[in-house]
């Protein structure tokens, strides 16, 4: 017999509906649950003993997480997307027009379709539990709220508040949701059912009248201004690459100017267009990829991992301090070592600064900041490292230095302690050469700034023990990172794939292209920053050093132009030296440092380069190297390559990652473009053998 999602209890006329989808950690709005809910609503309409209804969750920290996202992957046309949206409208229209008042009792996450269900209820009560959050994150999947949320929310709280929620996808804590008018009441978790039941009785008896702000008069008068500003803001932030926020603005604008029924029809058509589009499909694929890597971590299932309670960090620079701050935030005690008190002081100051940023945004209190800082103890020696579960080395990118600190660490730590290098390019096996415990050594490549960048690349050598790998991966997930596991090799995946992309930007500069034209072309393509700006952030000296490591292993395709050494010798190390391709004079708007051109061939004489030519050269250099990483076994799967590129390197999410993008264009088209570039620019554009094979056989990287 099929298990039911709902259980019922009639409390003297108030029907308590408890939603607990069987066999799932969270409640989702799947087809079976929706059908059962609709049948219950029909029964309520005919049952005079029911005077009011309370809907609550049987899950401990979740009300409803939203729709079953797998259903979105089955949409093959705009018409199918419209039908799915209209089905949601039908059930929530029935809920909204129910014979008796319905109260949503919200505890835990209430997102997407869960929020839309609550909006169709007469009254909403939420707990003040920290895990309670209410939001409409559909825009993050390239969609809009398609079950009535794009119409009901603005009618409830007004245009400005609803647009902010819908366009950002941000979820609100209960207190903010109350202030915004999204919920009607907030209470402690233990009394949620009592408060919701009392509200249901009050509504049924006419004693309780919910407050409804609606669309304020000021917003009605300023409608054109509000929508114009919202549209301009979206285009500025997204470059117009994401259609969902623009569709959302249009749906709210048109929907609130007509009846709810007509507004819902506008919403359904927009949802249909988006759900069948390439951007939504790409973003949904990224979502599933991030879920899959949590289950497939590159080591046997059931491998025991050390629970990291004490962490040692070697180096108090931006990376070391960032790692220490991330660890302390999740309750890990950190021992941070550097060579001088001055360096340690700068590291602690940096951590404090990142925490204070969060305090100013009210996501931390002063007490929280103090507790996190108290978990980090600075040191000039290895005292305290003997009790560490994991050591992360974040010293300068120098092989001999890294070998020395590894040897010192092994002498100061327990046998089972795991040692991780944060190197961005040096093979881990070379660092571990001659060490006493190679099975406990691996790489943990963080990205800067650590508190903002969501990727962690864990590098395993052939000798790395599964237990050590499990410990590193577990720690990475604990601090909130998307973790990919790659095989050891020069540059691993991310640095190796990024290098030809950055190199090509420098080659363009030596051929006469202007700095701003290159950066503008790549931000227009969808990258958050241009490659020349990124070189200034990384440091041209670092790029040159990495380039030399990669050339040793991969030959001339990784070579930077000779002018690179000239620029490094001139002290053009980027932001850190306040001298690079751009000026760093304290002004908000950066300017190109025109004097850099005197160090390049053709001097200050610049030529116009077509945006498409810039994009083709840089993007195909990147795509080809990504395929070579898969071909060489550095990457375990195309999925990992997509996740790594998007969350570590800024590859445009709306393209789904390099391998999804190649699937979309077709391997044959990619090989053709690479051959064209090879004919113009030389052997560095030679297509990967794997890509040529796939073109011949008509295969794709992903099954669907």
Segments the model singles out, each with a brief description of its role:
Residues 8-10, 20, 74-75, 84-87, ...:
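N-terminal glycine-rich phosphate-binding loop for ADP-containing cofactors
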Residues 14-18, 52-56, 103-105, 125, ...:
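Structural motif
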Residues 58, 89, 94-141, 145, ...:
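Glycine-rich beta-to-alpha active-site loop
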Residues 37-40, 44, 117, 323, ...:
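Structural preference for long, well-ordered alpha-helical segments in enzyme cores
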Residues 1-56, 93:
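Conserved CoA-thioester-binding segment of acyl-CoA-metabolizing enzymes
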Residues 57-91, 110, 140-142:
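Glycine- (often His-adjacent) and acidic-residue-rich active-site loop
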């Amino acid at each position: 017999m099929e298990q039911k999602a709902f259980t019922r209890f009639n409390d003297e006329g108030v029907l308590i509906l408890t939603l607990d989808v069987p066999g799932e950690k969270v409640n989702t709005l799947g087809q079976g649950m929706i059908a059962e809910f609709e049948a219950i609503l029909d029964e309520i309409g005919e049952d005079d003993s029911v005077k009011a209804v309370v809907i609550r969750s049987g899950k401990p920290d979740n009300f409803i997480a939203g729709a079953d996202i797998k259903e979105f992957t089955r949409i093959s046309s705009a018409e199918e997307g419209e039908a799915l949206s209209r089905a949601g409208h039908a059930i929530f229209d029935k809920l909204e027009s129910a014979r008796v008042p319905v109260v949503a009792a919200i505890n835990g996450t209430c997102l997407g379709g869960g929020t839309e269900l609550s909006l169709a209820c007469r009254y909403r009560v939420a707990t003040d539990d920290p895990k309670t959050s209410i939001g409409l994150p559909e825009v993050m999947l390239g969609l809009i709220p398609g079950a009535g949320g794009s119409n009901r929310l603005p009618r409830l709280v007004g245009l400005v508040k609803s647009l902010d929620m819908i366009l950002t996808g941000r979820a609100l804590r209960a207190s903010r949701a109350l202030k915004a008018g999204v919920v009607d009441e907030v209470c402690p978790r233990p009394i949620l059912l009592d408060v919701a039941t009392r509200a249901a009785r009050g509504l049924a008896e006419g004693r309780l009248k919910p407050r409804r702000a609606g669309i304020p008069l000021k917003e009605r008068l300023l409608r054109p201004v509000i929508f114009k500003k919202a549209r301009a803001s979206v285009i500025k932030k997204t470059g117009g690459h994401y259609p969902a926020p623009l569709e959302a603005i249009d749906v709210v604008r048109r929907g609130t100017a007509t009846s709810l029924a007509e507004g819902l029809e506008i919403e359904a058509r927009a949802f249909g267009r988006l759900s069948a589009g390439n951007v939504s499909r790409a973003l949904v694929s990224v979502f599933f990829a991030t879920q899959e890597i949590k289950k497939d971590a590159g080591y046997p299932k059931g491998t025991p991992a050390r629970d990291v309670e004490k962490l040692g960090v070697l180096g108090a620079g931006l990376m070391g301090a960032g790692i220490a701050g991330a660890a302390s935030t999740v309750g890990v005690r950190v021992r941070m070592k550097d060579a001088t008190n001055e360096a340690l002081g700068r590291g602690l100051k940096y951590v404090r600064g990142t925490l204070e940023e969060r305090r100013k945004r009210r996501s931390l209190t002063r007490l929280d900041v103090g507790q996190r800082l108290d978990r980090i103890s600075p040191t000039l020696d290895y005292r305290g490292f003997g009790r560490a579960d994991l050591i992360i080395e974040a010293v300068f990118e120098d092989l001999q230095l890294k070998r020395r600190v590894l040897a010192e660490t092994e002498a100061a730590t327990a046998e089972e302690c795991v040692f991780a290098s944060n190197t961005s390019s040096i093979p881990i096996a070379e660092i571990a050469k001659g060490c006493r415990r190679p099975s406990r050594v691996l790489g943990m490549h963080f990205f800067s700034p650590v508190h903002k960048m969501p990727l962690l690349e864990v590098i395993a050598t052939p000798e790395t023990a599964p237990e050590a790998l499990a410990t590193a991966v577990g720690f990475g997930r604990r601090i909130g990172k998307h973790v990919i596991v790659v095989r050891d090799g020069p540059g691993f995946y991310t640095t190796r794939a990024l290098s030809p992309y950055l190199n090509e930007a420098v080659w363009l500069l030596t051929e006469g292209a202007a700095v701003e034209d290159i950066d503008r072309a790549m931000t227009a393509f969808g990258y958050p920053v241009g490659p020349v700006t990124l070189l200034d952030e990384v440091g041209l000296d670092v790029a040159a050093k990495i380039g030399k490591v990669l050339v040793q292993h991969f030959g001339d395709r990784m070579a930077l132009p000779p002018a690179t050494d000239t620029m490094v010798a001139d002290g053009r190390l980027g932001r850190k030296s306040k001298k690079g391709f751009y000026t760093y004079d304290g002004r908000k708007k950066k300017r190109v440092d025109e004097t850099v051109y005197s160090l390049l061939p053709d001097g200050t004489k610049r030529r116009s380069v077509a945006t498409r030519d810039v994009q083709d050269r840089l993007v195909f250099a990147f795509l080809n190297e990504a395929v070579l990483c898969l071909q060489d076994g550095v990457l375990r799967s195309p999925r990992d390559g997509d996740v790594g590129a998007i969350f570590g390197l800024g590859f445009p999410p709306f393209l789904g990652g390099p391998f999804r993008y190649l699937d979309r264009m077709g391997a044959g088209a990619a090989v053709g473009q690479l051959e064209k570039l090879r004919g113009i620019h030389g052997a560095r554009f030679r297509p990967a053998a794997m890509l040529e094979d796939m073109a011949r056989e008509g295969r794709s990287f992903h099954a669907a």
